[in-house]
């Protein structure tokens, strides 16, 4: 059926709905038939403020105080902020970027050494630095080491003497003149005391446009990297970004805050959101892991497409399936990345294919890439998979074509008779994209099996690779004359 004929048929079907009881919401829906794509804007790079200091001096609490919301994971355990994390902030009408870093320990071993290295990188990428010291502890040898690094940076440095909760404790802040960084600013991240005055001074030193940050594009496609702890999410982002962006350690769960990074892949910019992994038994978790899990869900809400990373060296688990189901519930596009593929032998590969067929049958439509995040093998296949998934996610089927599709489908395979009645599809329309959401007006309730059949046929005819499809029903009765 050509487009003109399909449109004429749809108009006739639509007019037939006037014989049925329609409410205001129905009428509003029937008027919708346009694109809903967001415009992409280009924004100047915002000035960057890095917040650095030893572990557990209150850096993340200060970030939360500046932002006015709980963003950085805060706990009374040294080293709980392990990655460099960027947040957008605004103060007195000025927008800027805040970078929270893990704590410094000059002689750190293992993961602490990685965090220290990232803090040094953060200083290089900042326009100004807030150096946080615990005024109640005073200057330590570690602080002296940090001061030497700060002096090398030649950046404006503001000394925040934290944990000064009232005027009686201000002499402790005064003692920090000894560090040679100029005036110590007594603040209390816990109570907010002194933070506003310090921010006023910092903003005077920050340029209007960052001298160091990459140019920020307003609309890079947003990708959430999801998966169980230690499946290779951070390694995947590091390989894509070409730098040690996220602390990678064999200890499961070493990523606690989602970390955004703009990465150029396949000739375009993407914004990857690396997450903490979704933990089992959330209600049993310690504080930091609990909040990080909540943040993972938030990261997914901010994303347009999710890459779920699965470790092929282990069987597909219930937790893997739950993470995939979370993506489906959120309505995001989906790509499956099977990591550590280079480690598979033939026997494990055959067994894995059977697992995929059995456990992931409900997402057989998702693009699949077999990669090695560690070596970067087949990473180039990720971009075409993301592009296909996003294109499907934004697809809109014209109303005429959709109704022609429904007519052909119901003619070849009408709904079964139930209780002496056979529900009919009167008319259909696509209400939105992102994900594609269809509404059908019917004379009766459609069986779940029949709805699955409609969705399956939609995929066969139109593709929709990499996106969930939502099919809603509106059962309507004829008007009583």
Swiss-Prot record:
Signal peptide: none
Record NCBIfam families: GTPase_EngA, PRK03003.1, small_GTP
Residues in KH-like domain copies: 395-477
CDD domains reported in the protein's UniProt record: EngA1 (cd01894), EngA2 (cd01895)
Gene name, Swiss-Prot/TrEMBL: der
Function comment: GTPase that plays an essential role in the late steps of ribosome biogenesis.
Gene Ontology BP term (one): ribosome biogenesis
Bridged cysteine pairs (disulfide): none
HAMAP family tied to this protein: GTPase_Der
Pfam families on file: KH_dom-like, MMR_HSR1
MF GO annotations: ATP hydrolysis activity; GTP binding; ribosome binding
Protein's name in the database: GTPase Der
Quaternary state and interactors: Associates with the 50S ribosomal subunit.
Classification via InterPro entries: AAA+_ATPase, G_ENGA, GTP-bd, GTPase_Der, KH_dom-like, KH_dom-like_a/b, P-loop_NTPase, Small_GTP-bd
Domain annotation EngA-type G: ranges: 47-210, 221-394
Residues reported to bind GTP 1: 53-60, 100-104, 162-165
Keyword entries, A-Z: GTP-binding, Nucleotide-binding, Repeat, Ribosome biogenesis
UniProt keyword Nucleotidyltransferase present: no
Binding site for GTP 2: 227-234, 274-278, 339-342
Similarity-based family: Belongs to the TRAFAC class TrmE-Era-EngA-EngB-Septin-like GTPase superfamily. EngA (Der) GTPase family.
């Amino acid at each position: 059926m050509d487009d003109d004929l399909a449109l004429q048929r749809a108009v006739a079907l639509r007019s037939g709905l006037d014989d049925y009881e329609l409410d205001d919401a129905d009428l509003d829906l029937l008027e919708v038939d346009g694109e809903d794509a967001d415009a992409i804007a280009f924004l100047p790079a915002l000035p960057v403020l890095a917040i650095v200091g030893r572990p557990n001096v209150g850096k993340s609490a200060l970030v939360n105080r500046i932002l006015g919301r709980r963003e950085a994971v805060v706990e009374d355990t040294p080293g709980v902020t392990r990655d460099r994390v960027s947040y957008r902030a605004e103060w007195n009408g000025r927008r800027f970027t805040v970078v929270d870093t893990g704590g410094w320990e000059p002689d750190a071993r293992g993961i602490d050494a990685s965090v220290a290295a990232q803090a040094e990188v953060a200083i290089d990428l900042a326009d100004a630095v807030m150096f946080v010291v615990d005024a109640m502890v005073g200057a330590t040898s570690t602080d002296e080491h940090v001061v030497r690094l700060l002096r090398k940076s030649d950046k404006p440095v503001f000394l925040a003497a934290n944990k000064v909760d009232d005027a009686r404790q201000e002499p402790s802040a005064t003692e920090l003149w000894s560090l040679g960084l100029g005036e110590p600013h007594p603040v209390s991240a816990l109570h907010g005391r002194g933070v506003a005055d310090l921010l006023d001074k910092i903003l005077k030193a920050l340029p209007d446009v960052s001298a160091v940050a990459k140019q920020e594009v307003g609309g890079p496609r947003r990708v959430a990297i999801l998966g169980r702890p230690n499946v290779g999410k951070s390694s995947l982002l590091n390989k894509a970004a070409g730098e040690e962006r996220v602390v990678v350690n064999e200890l499961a769960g070493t990523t606690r805050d989602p970390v955004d990074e703009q990465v150029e892949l396949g000739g375009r910019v993407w914004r990857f959101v690396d997450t903490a992994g979704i933990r089992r038994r959330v209600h049993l978790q310690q504080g930091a892991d609990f909040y990080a899990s909540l943040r993972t869900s938030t990261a997914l809400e901010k994303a347009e497409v999710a890459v779920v990373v699965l470790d092929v060296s282990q069987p597909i688990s219930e937790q893997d399936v739950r993470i995939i189901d979370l993506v489906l519930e959120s309505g995001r596009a989906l790509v499956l990345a099977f990591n550590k593929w280079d480690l598979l032998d033939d026997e494990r590969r055959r067994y894995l294919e059977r697992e995929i067929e059995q456990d992931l049958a409900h997402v057989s439509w998702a693009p699949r890439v077999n990669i090695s995040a560690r070596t970067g093998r087949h990473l180039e296949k990720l971009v075409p998979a993301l592009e296909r998934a996003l294109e499907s996610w934004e697809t809109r089927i014209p109303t005429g074509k959709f109704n022609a599709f429904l007519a052909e489908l119901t003619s070849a395979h009408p709904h079964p008779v139930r209780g002496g009645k056979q529900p009919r599809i009167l008319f259909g329309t696509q209400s939105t994209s992102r994900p594609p959401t269809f509404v059908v007006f019917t004379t009766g309730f459609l069986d779940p099996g029949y709805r699955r059949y409609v969705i399956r046929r939609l995929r066969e005819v139109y593709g929709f690779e990499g996106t969930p499809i939502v099919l809603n029903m509106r059962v309507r009765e004829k008007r009583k004359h």
